[in-house]
């Protein structure tokens, strides 16, 4: 499943995946920075296994917001 959310001039994309051999879900985080030069996408590792698809996505979006609020540096 995938969620995209606009946040403070960025786009947070959270993707979750169900594990095959174990119960639970893992997720990936991408943050897009849109500016006059185009779009820069930065990927982040999201630690942990989540009990549900929804909890994985919610946690990943919160991590994305924290990264933006903390002033991460987009990769060029």
Model-derived segments and spans:
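N-terminal segment of the canonical double-stranded RNA-binding domain
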Residues: 1-37
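Acidic, low-complexity intrinsically disordered segments
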Residues: 41-76
């Amino acid at each position: 499943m995938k969620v995209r959310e606009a946040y403070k001039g960025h786009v947070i994309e959270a993707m979750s995946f169900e594990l095959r051999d174990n119960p639970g879900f893992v997720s990936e985080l991408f943050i897009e920075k849109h500016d006059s030069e185009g779009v820069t996408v930065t990927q982040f590792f999201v630690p942990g296994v989540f009990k549900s698809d929804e909890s994985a996505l919610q946690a990943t979006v919160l991590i994305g917001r924290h990264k933006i609020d903390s002033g991460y540096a987009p990769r060029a």
